[in-house]
Amino acid sequence: MRQTILMKAMFATALLLMLGMTRTALYGQSSEERAKKAPAKTKVISTTQSGMPIVWRDPGTVETLDFVGGLGGREQAPKPPFTFIEEDRTGSNPKIKVMDANGVKWSVKWGSEVNAEVFASRIAWAAGYFVEPSYFVASGKIDGVKKLGRAKKYVNSDGNFTDARFEMNEKGITKLDDKQSWQWDRNSLVGTREFNGLKITMMLVSNFDNKDVRDLGRGSNTAIFQYPVGDTVESRYVVTDWGGSMGKWGGVFSREKWDCKGYAQQTPEFIKGVKGGFVVWGWSGQHTKDGAGGISGSDMKWLLQYIGRINDDQIRVGLKASGATQEESQCFSKALRDLILQMQIL
């Protein structure tokens, strides 16, 4: 009997060692090793040389977050007077670079994306995702404006403007964008609940514009922001443009930005069901499969711990702070709550 017990103990020890080796083989690989095994046709983005990649951080008590000030808070809102630096001719919308009274540099945007970008980024921020501090400025004046191209339509000769989005240029950050930006289907965070939660958040606000490093000709909407943290560097995966939100997802000729009627009309199509353990979404965008695929019910349940705690008052004040009219605020508030309810029911 003593020999039998000894043999069982030896077998159990061997089994544990085998399991440990298997786990190491599955999960202990570096991102470089995983990259070598990936198909050669698609470049694998790795940030291990620059620092640990991260896409999400616990937002804390979601119910108390200020949707007026957002990430930057009310105290960091752009302060006039604004001084012209130069016109930014990149992207599809008119933009100007300015400096405010506090010496902070801002990217000022006009056009169809202004309201959507401010509000959608508030939702992403409340869910724990990294965004850039942005504010809606109803009117103002930029001193020293000259030689405007696209922005001439939105800025008078005396520098006065209306309905602009101000996005802060944070100091001390290295931004890896364009050719160094990340790809939705090829990065070290694919398959994690945090990364899948980002995809759900994109669909929740109906952001069809999930362009990435594959779309350099049209401009990537992803980037890696390197933040110094002590003696190390934290590499944050960021969606840099939320302007294609709060409207209709779909093809080139059907999608819209900041269109509550279209946003509400697509509410019944938000979630189609569940197949093979994965949620089937109605959403479509620039990269539909990469944006909607591989999301489980447990991923959605995890995200609801944060998204589900955003209250109606926060939504309303956030919409108002984004420049929404009272009618738009009522419409968007109801539609967004209905979408969150669909997730909770499923």
Language-model regions, residue ranges each:
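Conserved kinase catalytic-core segment
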Residues: 114-117, 122, 177-256
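Internal hydrophobic scaffold segments of catalytic domains
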Residues: 29-42, 118-149, 229-274
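Bacterial N-terminal signal peptides
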Residues: 10-20
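C-terminal catalytic region of ATP-dependent kinase domains
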Residues: 227-346
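Conserved ATP-binding subdomain of kinase catalytic cores across diverse folds
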Residues: 69-184, 207
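Extracytoplasmic/secreted envelope proteins and their assembly/folding machinery
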Residues: 95, 117, 121, 198-201, ...
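Regulatory N- and C-terminal appendages and interdomain linkers associated
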Residues: 2-5, 18-84, 100, 309-346
